[in-house]
Amino acid sequence: MTDSEYSSAADAVANLVRRVPGFPSEGVVFEDLTPVLADAGAFRLIVDELAEAARSYHADIIGGLDARGFLLGSAVAYQLGLGILAVRKEGKLPPPVFHRGYDLEYGHAALEIPREGLNIQGKNIVLIDDVLATGGTLCASRALLEEAGANVAGLAVILEVEALEGRKRLADLPLTVVGERSE
């Protein structure tokens, strides 16, 4: 087990996140979690908190959103003894797929999951991502999973950009936010 110099996951996020104004476009402040995830103690604290959220939402499967949600979701799924479903960016999976477009804080994108080979009907899936901004990514992921017959039981992220009000689009779902945005 790795000890941490931080008292909590929120403390680790507050001290390690790197904020980059103007990236990837003017007016956006990019929340770079690379230093947070690279710190073993901070990573453990974050995964522990995300796992507790997923446990409390009665997850059967963890849904990890492309790309940092893969890192977080895999660690959480492993800790809980669950499977991980990678919700992929458009064009990364062979057909047939469930497909959903959405708007980002700084553009447009689409997500996909396989249409065949999954047994997720009626399963409780907890979606894990790095940042909740506009809510577009999580809403699109939810729509994909519900179209496939799954139940999205809850959401867990490291950071929330409150000014973009993504939480409002997902108000009917339980949400865990590990860290607080300082700006």
Swiss-Prot record:
It catalyses: AMP + diphosphate = 5-phospho-alpha-D-ribose 1-diphosphate + adenine. SUPFAM superfamilies: PRTase-like. Its EC number is 2.4.2.7. It is found in: Cytoplasm. The keyword Cytoplasm applies. It is an enzyme of class 2 (transferase). The keyword Cell inner membrane does not apply. It comes from the Bacteria. Transmembrane segments: none annotated. GO terms for biological process: adenine salvage; AMP salvage; purine ribonucleoside salvage. One of its GO terms (cellular component) is cytoplasm. Keywords: Cytoplasm, Glycosyltransferase, Purine salvage, Transferase. PROSITE patterns: PUR_PYR_PR_TRANSFER. Pathway: Purine metabolism; AMP biosynthesis via salvage pathway; AMP from adenine: step 1/1. GO terms for molecular function: adenine binding; adenine phosphoribosyltransferase activity; AMP binding. HAMAP family: Aden_phosphoribosyltr (MF_00004). Catalyzes a salvage reaction resulting in the formation of AMP, that is energically less costly than de novo synthesis. NCBIfam families: PRK02304.1-3 (NF002634), PRK02304.1-5 (NF002636). Belongs to the purine/pyrimidine phosphoribosyltransferase family. Homodimer. This is Adenine phosphoribosyltransferase. It comes from Corynebacterium kroppenstedtii (strain DSM 44385 / JCM 11950 / CIP 105744 / CCUG 35717).
